[in-house]
């Protein structure tokens, strides 16, 4: 089945053929305490750690996480590296060593000056997911019962917003 893009000013209707092989691989968030962040993204949201890379000379570590849904992830380092950088929808957490003990915070983009906004997870049952998040003590930025219907926002340990949606509830979203 071919994909027909929505028509909007600025959209290229026929991208170069070579781009058909491109993959949106990952987005990166800076984190202060990798233990807290890894716990949040693995225990609360179910992501798996694909790869950790340490850079002694730069004093930072990278953690690559994804939803694997039972996929076989290669054990061999070179194969795992290719798997990590060849798949879609990876979250990279970057930890600059020593940042966990300083008083500064990373800017989440949702206060002035605005910029980055959020990442999003789709869940099969929005109400059940939100009840589970409450039980786990997750911070809600926007609970289900406030504002726009059928969407919730939680925040991770660094204050980044995570949107939670249920695809089957959003067919009419944005249709006036």
UniProtKB/Swiss-Prot annotation:
Catalyzes the conversion of hemimercaptal, formed from methylglyoxal and glutathione, to S-lactoylglutathione. The keyword Zinc applies. Substrate binds at residues 30, 96, 114, 118. Pfam families: Glyoxalase. Residues 23-167 form the VOC domain. GO terms for molecular function: lactoylglutathione lyase activity; zinc ion binding. This is Lactoylglutathione lyase. It is an enzyme of class 4 (lyase). Its EC number is 4.4.1.5. Its cofactor is Ni(2+); Zn(2+). The active site is at 163 (proton donor/acceptor). Keywords: Lyase, Metal-binding, Nickel, Zinc. GO terms for biological process: methylglyoxal catabolic process to D-lactate via S-lactoyl-glutathione. Disulfide bonds: none annotated. It comes from the Bacteria. Ni(2+) binds at residues 26, 92, 118, 163. Pathway: Secondary metabolite metabolism; methylglyoxal degradation; (R)-lactate from methylglyoxal: step 1/2. It comes from Pseudomonas aeruginosa (strain ATCC 15692 / DSM 22644 / CIP 104116 / JCM 14847 / LMG 12228 / 1C / PRS 101 / PAO1). Belongs to the glyoxalase I family. Binds 1 nickel or zinc ion per subunit. It catalyses: (R)-S-lactoylglutathione = methylglyoxal + glutathione.
């Amino acid at each position: 089945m071919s994909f027909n893009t929505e028509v909007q000013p600025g959209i290229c209707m026929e991208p170069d053929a070579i781009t058909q092989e491109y993959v949106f691989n990952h987005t990166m968030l800076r984190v202060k305490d990798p233990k807290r962040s890894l716990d949040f993204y693995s225990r609360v949201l179910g992501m798996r750690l694909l790869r950790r890379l340490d850079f002694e000379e730069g004093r930072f570590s990278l953690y690559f996480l994804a939803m694997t849904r039972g996929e076989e992830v290669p054990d061999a380092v070179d194969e795992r590296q290719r798997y990590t950088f060849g798949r879609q929808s990876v979250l990279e957490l970057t930890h600059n060593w020593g940042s966990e003990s300083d008083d500064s915070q990373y800017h989440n983009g949702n206060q002035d000056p605005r910029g980055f906004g959020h990442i999003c997870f789709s869940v099969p049952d929005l109400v059940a997911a939100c009840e589970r998040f409450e039980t786990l003590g997750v911070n809600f930025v926007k609970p289900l019962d406030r504002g726009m219907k059928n969407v919730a926002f939680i925040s991770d340990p660094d204050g980044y917003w995570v949107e939670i949606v249920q695809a089957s509830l959003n067919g009419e979203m944005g249709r006036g």
